[in-house]
């Protein structure tokens, strides 16, 4: 049962009405990989864009709050008329760990989800996290079936959110000379966070963000289909985990209370609560908004070019 805080910024109804996605992305286990099992959500639409979004916590990071933990999200974007519809396909949380292990998991999700961009909070771990991301990463299990290349920032001012000088600075820090340009770093500020919350609320209220169905519904589907009876306990836990994480994300969001000061919105979690998942969701939505604008401009230009061709004809 979900409950909202009395001064909740988000309305539970805007989440509940959009819990319609039946199929979650399920990352492969080491056994899946060695058995050459097909990747989950392997069929990617021609105009679909996929994001891996992360807020990272590290062991011994004194700058983090005690209730912080690492959050990974997988979000796919599907063009609908004049903007991308956001689908939240997967969520994973874990306690803080070493930067090398966190980055390895990030890169696993990037390749297994067939992502186009990796969005991450660059405050977490300082510049060290970028160094780990930008250098080659060997996989202890996948060997030659793994692309070890480093990642670097995307050289596109329309997509980047932090000041361009910071992008150039990070680009110059890149370790692997053959690094793939896929990174979109985020550095949260009061202004950016306020804009992010407002944009997230708008997209929720216009039914533009779709979520996985509730965990109980996912469990019932596994039983009804008979798949439940073929699964080990580990397989079952893995299959329902993203749905449970979605339920927790929604509860986390509707528990956030709003404070208004100097024209900005600040969201605050309950004393023993979290807002890590909500922050990651807002970051993914902000990047999706940048992609909305870019594709809308491209479509507008294409329409203008077609009109000019028709006039010449």
Where are the model-predicted features located?
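Short alpha-helix plus adjacent loop in nuclease-associated cores
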Residues: 145-218
